[in-house]
């Protein structure tokens, strides 16, 4: 039985009725018990797609839910293993999740089955939910957390998407569940998704990075060990969103999110024009403390006025009136809280918008939802249509995901914000309803290959020493600066390097490495696949493919001064990521779709140039992570000094973070396009997005790996604090070097093709500085001046065009000469 394509099938005593949600490795169905007719939801997980980590999370979720029964926790009714599937039969929550409830709070009047809520509890002007609803949901969430605390459990992923809603309980239900708190005349909240939950003793500390960054405690974002108080920060973020209508802190990535949290210095801002009760403000401020020691504890939270004060049940509607109203709620919910990396999908034959009860109900009532009516994350203005700011929505097609992973929805995740080998991080769960990253911060092994071209690029920079950007870092944790040395990590020589095999340094004394480059290759110990050269093959290539080939297949032999190497590359080949017979931009595509792909290709070229600059610096770091030199190593293979190692790591770190920012721009553009277009994503678009997702995963994992190196090495060697390392400065100066080298080579009459490639790469690097809101540190020079950058790009482009015209003329002249020679030779032969 193929559950992924069939409905009205049976699983034990349950009948599957319709699909209500879909993720990269799980599908959620609405169903019912054949005998009792109880409506339930069935989460069907295809086990072969799960990595070891994800399977452990699933088993943990099952074991936890089997042991707990609470009125404000989603009930696990049954667990059935059938072939390749594990089916979790769970309580069905017909009102969807709290995130959509908050988002559509002003539209309840247009939905007969929900209009009763706004009769007595209208939303606050220019804020969030009605105060009574805020207190009601907070009390029910507190009840669920208090129950978990009694079982020594920490949820680790408290957010609106994991808080599901049911219609108000009946009198019979209340008699069966004396634990119920709050008002019986309001929707009932239930905590769901225990995929990241774990047992944690009061004195224990955890260190795994998981959950959704918008609601994640800063100690987790800083990779510090944390305890159950991390959930309290998440509660504060949820409480703020209920009261205000939006999260307390928003950012395009987790690094910028932490920077904004730190910049706030525990000062929580509330909208001046909205009235929010002082009791609620006080509790929010007590929960949203950066330092866990300053944060209110569980006893303080459970005894707070907001949680303990009984609600006023005064209502113009009786209990029977409410029950009559909610009887009409029969639209299936597609709440993302059931699936860790969720992407909604419409049912075949009965298309419906994703997003659960509320969004579907709007369509059922004939309500037209315009982009301007939806609040969401910022989208660059270049992607907006009709002057409206568009929401950030998950953009990853579920079918395009490789095998499973634990990594945006951004997205997932942006995330989003989607997978391959069992340990590879991807961005499928990033962008999960704008909560864009779900990762484990420990270095993870993967078979994904590093580019050999990056092994030699920039080796001319003082051998193995870092670029002369001596600067450092004073604690500003952002894409422009490296992380703070606030705690130690395990010794880096024992770390597993991302995308490398453990213990990859061979002990064979006959393996002689004469340069750091060959030592690095020895460390990688991987076979890579060739990428077709830009001139090979008669097939028509897209700009994205050409850009990738330019930046990879020729990077090593063109960009590096005085060094060539015809090694292989690890960037996705046509066989692996881009279909062999597909040209990404096809003439038959609609103009809007073609424009989208043009934008994606442009961003891909800019992102790829920054990514490889980061790869070069990472390649110089790897050989120094070995504890001792190997037989046959030369002086050039001598490890870097701790200071040089940390400086190189900082430079590589900020470049990977910049690459992540560029990739997020692409995700935002796709989200904006889909929000304003009724077109379905073409296979070409899905392939392009898949490439962005995989690159996002790689950059994120490597940046985290470098962060651990920086912290551990700085702590181990007591390195002095230096000035912040600027990604913009690194990119700017490298672009200048490339353009100067290309101009010098051109004047010397050297390889014209190599000069062209250097010009192109320099232009892409400079263009990346103009993409999105990329700020530079105070005091930055011309690299912070967009006018200067645009002028440089214009000059480089002009030089490139002149050189191309010279090449064309030279080719024509050569052909003429050859033709004349043949004509002259013909009579002689005769």
UniProtKB/Swiss-Prot annotation:
GO molecular function: ATP binding; protein serine kinase activity; protein serine/threonine kinase activity
Enzyme Commission number(s) of this protein: 2.7.11.1
Comp. bias regions, Polar residues: 448-468
Region (Disordered): 448-480
Domain Protein kinase: 14-307
A Pfam match: ATG1-like_MIT2
Statement: the UniProt record of this protein carries the keyword Transmembrane: no
Keyword Heme: no
Membrane-spanning segments: none
Lineage top rank: taxon: Eukaryota
Keyword line: ATP-binding, Autophagy, Kinase, Nucleotide-binding, Phosphoprotein, Protein transport, Serine/threonine-protein kinase, Transferase, Transport
Cellular component terms per the entry's GO annotation: Atg1/ULK1 kinase complex; autophagosome; cytoplasm; cytosol; fungal-type vacuole membrane; nucleus; phagophore assembly site; phagophore assembly site membrane
Consequences of knocking out this gene: Impairs atg8-processing.
InterPro entries xref list: Atg1-like, ATG1-like_MIT2, Atg1-like_tMIT, Kinase-like_dom_sf, Prot_kinase_dom, Ser/Thr_kinase_AS
Residue numbers of Phosphoserine PTMs: 346
Enzyme active site: 157
Reactions performed catalytically: L-seryl-[protein] + ATP = O-phospho-L-seryl-[protein] + ADP + H(+); L-threonyl-[protein] + ATP = O-phospho-L-threonyl-[protein] + ADP + H(+)
PTM per Swiss-Prot/TrEMBL: Phosphorylated. Dephosphorylated under depletion of nitrogen.
Gene Ontology BP annotations: autophagosome assembly; macroautophagy; mitophagy; piecemeal microautophagy of the nucleus; protein transport; regulation of autophagy; response to starvation; reticulophagy
Binding site for ATP: 20-28, 43
Quaternary structure, from the entry: Homodimer. Component of the atg1 kinase complex composed of at least atg1, atg13, atg17 and atg101. Interacts directly with atg13.
Protein task: Serine/threonine protein kinase involved in the cytoplasm to vacuole transport (Cvt) and found to be essential in autophagy, where it is required for the formation of autophagosomes. Involved in the clearance of protein aggregates which cannot be efficiently cleared by the proteasome. Required for selective autophagic degradation of the nucleus (nucleophagy) as well as for mitophagy which contributes to regulate mitochondrial quantity and quality by eliminating the mitochondria to a basal level to fulfill cellular energy requirements and preventing excess ROS production.
Stated family: Belongs to the protein kinase superfamily. Ser/Thr protein kinase family. APG1/unc-51/ULK1 subfamily.
UniProt protein name: Serine/threonine-protein kinase atg1
Source organism per UniProt: Schizosaccharomyces pombe (strain 972 / ATCC 24843)
């Amino acid at each position: 039985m193929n559950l992924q394509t069939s409905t009205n099938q049976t699983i034990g005593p349950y009948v599957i009725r319709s699909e209500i949600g879909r993720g990269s490795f799980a599908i959620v169905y609405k169903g019912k018990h054949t005998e009792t007719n109880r409506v339930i939801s069935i989460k069907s997980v295809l086990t072969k797609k799960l990595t070891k980590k994800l399977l452990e999370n699933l088993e943990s979720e099952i074991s936890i839910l089997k042991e707990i029964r609470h009125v404000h926790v989603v009930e696990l009714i049954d667990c059935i293993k059938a072939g390749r599937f594990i089916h979790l039969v769970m309580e069905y929550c017909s009102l969807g999740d709290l995130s959509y409830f908050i988002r559509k709070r002003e539209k309840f009047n247009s939905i007969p089955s929900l209009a009763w809520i706004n009769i007595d509890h209208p939303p606050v002007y220019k804020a969030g939910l009605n105060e009574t609803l805020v207190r009601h949901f907070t009390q029910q969430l507190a009840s669920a957390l208090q129950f978990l605390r009694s079982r020594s459990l920490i949820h680790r992923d408290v957010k609106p998407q994991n808080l599901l809603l049911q219609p108000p309980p009946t009198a019979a239900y209340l008699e069966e569940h004396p634990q119920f708190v709050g008002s019986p005349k309001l929707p009932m909240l239930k905590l769901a998704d225990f995929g990241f939950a774990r047992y944690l003793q009061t004195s224990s500390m955890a260190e795994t990075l998981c959950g959704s960054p918008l609601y994640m405690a800063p100690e987790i974002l800083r990779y510090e060990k944390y305890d159950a108080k991390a959930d309290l920060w998440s509660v504060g973020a949820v409480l703020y969103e209920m009261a205000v209508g939006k999260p307390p802190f928003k950012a395009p990535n987790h690094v910028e999110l932490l920077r904004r949290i730190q910049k706030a210095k525990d000062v929580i801002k509330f909208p001046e024009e909205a009235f929010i009760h002082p009791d609620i403000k006080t509790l929010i401020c007590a929960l949203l403390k950066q330092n866990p020691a300053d944060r209110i504890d569980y006893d303080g939270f459970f005894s707070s006025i907001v949680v303990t004060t009984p609600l006023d049940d005064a209502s113009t509607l009786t209990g029977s009136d409410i029950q009559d109203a909610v009887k009409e709620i029969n639209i299936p919910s597609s709440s993302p809280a059931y699936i860790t990396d969720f992407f909604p999908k419409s049912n075949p034959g009965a298309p419906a918008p994703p997003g659960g009860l509320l969004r579907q109900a709007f369509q059922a009532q004939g309500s037209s939802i315009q982009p301007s009516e939806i609040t969401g994350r910022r989208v660059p203005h270049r992607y907006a249509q009709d002057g409206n700011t568009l929401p950030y929505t998950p953009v990853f097609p579920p079918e395009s995901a490789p095998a499973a992973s634990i990594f945006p929805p951004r997205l997932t995740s942006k995330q989003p914000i989607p997978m391959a080998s069992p340990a590879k991080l991807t961005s499928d769960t990033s962008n999960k309803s704008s909560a864009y990253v779900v990762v484990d911060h420990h270095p993870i092994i993967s078979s994904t290959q590093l580019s050999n071209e990056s092994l030699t690029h920039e080796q001319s920079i003082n051998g193995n020493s870092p670029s002369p950007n001596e600067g450092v870092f004073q604690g500003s944790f952002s894409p422009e600066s490296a992380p703070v040395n606030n705690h130690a990590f395990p010794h880096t020589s024992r770390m597993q390097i991302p995308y490398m095999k453990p213990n990859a340094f061979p002990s064979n004394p006959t393996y002689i490495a004469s340069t750091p480059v060959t030592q690095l290759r020895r460390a990688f110990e991987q076979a890579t696949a060739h990428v077709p050269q830009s001139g090979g093959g008669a097939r028509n290539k897209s700009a994205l493919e050409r850009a990738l080939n330019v930046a990879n297949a020729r990077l090593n032999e063109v960009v590096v001064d005085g060094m060539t190497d015809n090694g292989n590359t690890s960037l996705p080949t046509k066989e692996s990521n881009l279909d062999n017979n597909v040209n990404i931009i096809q003439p038959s595509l609609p103009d809007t779709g073609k424009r989208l792909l043009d934008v994606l290709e442009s961003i891909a070229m800019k992102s790829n140039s920054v990514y490889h600059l980061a790869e070069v610096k990472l390649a110089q770091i790897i050989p120094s992570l070995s504890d001792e030199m190997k037989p046959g190593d030369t002086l050039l293979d001598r490890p870097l000094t701790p200071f040089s190692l940390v400086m190189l790591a900082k430079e590589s770190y900020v470049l990977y973070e910049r690459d992540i920012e560029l990739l997020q721009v692409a995700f935002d553009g796709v989200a904006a396009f889909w929000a304003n277009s009724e077109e379905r994503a073409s296979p070409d678009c899905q392939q392009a997005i898949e490439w962005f997702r995989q690159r996002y995963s790689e950059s994120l994992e490597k940046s985290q790996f470098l962060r651990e190196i920086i912290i551990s090495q700085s702590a181990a060697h007591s390195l002095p604090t230096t000035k912040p390392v600027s990604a913009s400065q690194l990119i700017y100066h490298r672009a200048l070097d490339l353009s100067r080298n290309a101009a010098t080579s051109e004047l010397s009459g050297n390889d014209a093709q190599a000069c062209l490639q250097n010009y192109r790469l320099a232009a892409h690097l400079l263009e990346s500085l103009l993409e999105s809101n990329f700020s530079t540190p105070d005091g930055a020079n011309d690299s912070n001046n967009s006018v200067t950058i645009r002028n440089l790009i214009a000059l480089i482009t002009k030089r490139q065009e002149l050189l191309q015209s010279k090449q064309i003329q030279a080719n024509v002249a050569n052909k003429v000469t050859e033709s004349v020679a043949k004509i002259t030779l013909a009579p002689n032969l005769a």
